[in-house]
């Protein structure tokens, strides 16, 4: 039984009731109780340890001043909006980002639809129209390399220059470093592509994972005795091609598994897929949402001379995966 998981990113459309006490805004109709707050700003893809440092500092400031605390983020990411050729860029989906932010107990999250009109706002227009008019922001937390406004002309100097005019205080959070390297989403994407999952885990503060909805596939894995879930990676960052040990979350059930990322050269495949064999699962998972956590890289992708060679190798991979997870 083979399934095809087609990852559908939840762009802007959020069910607020699914995210506990954190209010998710998909527009700028901000409730009065969230005005005059402490606000962090950024894309926060992956929500890594550096992002968490910014959010923890901002949350502490809010607590000391008896204020609400929230985050302004953008969908899609400005990088993906301006460069349509970038297809595999996300560390996490929007829904995953919301889930992780909820665990950090933010009061609110504002998801700004990054479109042509928004991209044409000058730096001061962004400050005046959003941070001042809509939010009456008291404190703004950003990283040292923060850029904003049309053509990315706004930066921390711009924010500093407008503090008195728009009645806020800017706070800069220094970069978080691991082994003398600045932790960034770009660095994490690079390490994911290299298949160095232990390093990724340290920088994220958790295991890297993707989510997808199960749909029907071509049943090729079933025919050779290894039913798989096939995933089109869509906008997710593509890991190093090859075989991985994984954990798979299905509702409240967590199972071990093995995954292959590549083009299926033995079958002359053309499209990039992530195929996952879930240990001990035989039931129909059609339309189920799966969360797949990558544990360890096992081996590189390989073209086999025949199906029997492939089957023998899969058996060996499964043994290694069970020992690694």
Question: Language-model segments: what does each one mean?
Answer:
Residues 1-21:
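N-terminal amphipathic/basic-hydrophobic helices that include classical n-h-c signal peptides
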Residues 80-144, 148-166:
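N-terminal Rossmann-like or analogous alpha/beta NTP/dinucleotide-binding catalytic cores
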Residues 163-260:
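Glycine-rich, Lys/Arg-enriched anion-binding loops that position phosphate/diphosphate groups
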Residues 215-325:
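Phosphate/ribose-recognition catalytic cores of enzymes acting on nucleotide-derived substrates
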Residues 23-29:
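Short acidic-hydrophobic, aromatic-tinged amphipathic segments that line or gate anion-handling sites
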Residues 29-87, 93:
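N-terminal catalytic cores of NTP/NDP-binding nucleotidyl/phosphoryl-transfer enzymes
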């Amino acid at each position: 039984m083979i399934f095809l998981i087609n990852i559908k990113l939840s762009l802007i459309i959020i069910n607020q009731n699914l995210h506990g006490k954190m209010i998710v805004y998909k527009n700028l109709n901000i409730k009065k109780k969230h005005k005059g707050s402490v606000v962090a700003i950024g894309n926060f893809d992956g929500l890594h340890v550096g992002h968490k440092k910014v959010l923890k500092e901002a949350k502490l400031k809010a607590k000391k001043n008896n204020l609400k605390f929230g985050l302004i983020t953008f969908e899609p990411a400005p990088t993906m909006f301006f460069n349509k050729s970038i297809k595999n860029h996300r560390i996490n989906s929007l829904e995953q980002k919301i889930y992780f932010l909820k665990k950090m107990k933010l009061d609110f999250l504002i998801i700004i639809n990054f479109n042509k009109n928004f991209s044409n706002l000058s730096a001061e227009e962004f400050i005046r129209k959003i941070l001042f008019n809509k939010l009456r922001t008291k404190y703004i937390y950003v990283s040292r390399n923060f850029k904003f406004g049309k053509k990315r002309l706004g930066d921390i100097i711009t924010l500093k220059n407008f503090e008195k005019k728009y009645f806020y205080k800017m706070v800069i959070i220094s970069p978080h470093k691991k082994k003398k390297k600045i932790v960034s989403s770009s660095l994490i994407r690079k390490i994911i592509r290299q298949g160095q999952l232990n390093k990724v885990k340290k920088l994220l503060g958790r295991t890297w994972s993707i989510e997808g909805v199960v749909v029907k596939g071509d049943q090729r894995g079933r025919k050779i005795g290894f039913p798989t879930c096939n995933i089109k990676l869509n906008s997710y960052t593509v890991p190093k091609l090859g075989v991985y040990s994984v954990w798979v979350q299905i509702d409240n059930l967590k199972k071990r598994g093995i995954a292959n990322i590549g083009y299926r050269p033995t079958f002359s495949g053309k499209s990039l897929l992530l195929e996952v064999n879930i240990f001990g699962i035989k039931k129909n998972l059609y339309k189920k949402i799966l969360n797949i956590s990558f544990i360890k890289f096992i081996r590189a992708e390989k073209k086999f001379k025949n199906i029997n060679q492939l089957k023998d190798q899969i058996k060996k991979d499964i043994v290694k995966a069970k020992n690694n997870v």
